[in-house]
Amino acid sequence: MSQISRKQQTQKRHRRLRRHITGTSDRPRLAVFRSNNHIYAQVIDDAAQSTLCSASTVDKELRTGLKAPAGSCDASVAVGELVAKRAMAKGIQQVVFDRGGNLYHGRIKALADAAREAGLQF
């Protein structure tokens, strides 16, 4: 029997989750992508197939003020606060959280908690 790699497990979880999670114009989807070095968050309206706002550790606005490495929990907190601020500026109060197949732990949890603290409801 062959072992399933960690990446394949994440992809399998993501496909399973996306069957049940969709974003609407009333309640868009907060999608999170985590790489080894960076973290990205987008607020997506799946009905219109458009990205309403986004934030990541590669944003110039965030890179200048960020003292922690881009792959750390502190950077995830900063991205969560920034995406929540940008969503609130567009009038978005509630979102559906899409963890992208990643476990709700570490950097993903830090981003989600920071977005909640900044005012997003999910």
UniProtKB/Swiss-Prot annotation:
One of its GO terms (cellular component) is cytosolic large ribosomal subunit. CDD domains: Ribosomal_L18_L5e. Pfam families: Ribosomal_L18p (PF00861). Residues 9-21 have a biased composition (Basic residues). Residues 1-25 are annotated as: Disordered. Part of the 50S ribosomal subunit; part of the 5S rRNA/L5/L18/L25 subcomplex. Contacts the 5S and 23S rRNAs. PANTHER family: 39S RIBOSOMAL PROTEIN L18, MITOCHONDRIAL, LARGE RIBOSOMAL SUBUNIT PROTEIN UL18M. Belongs to the universal ribosomal protein uL18 family. This is Large ribosomal subunit protein uL18. The gene is rplR.
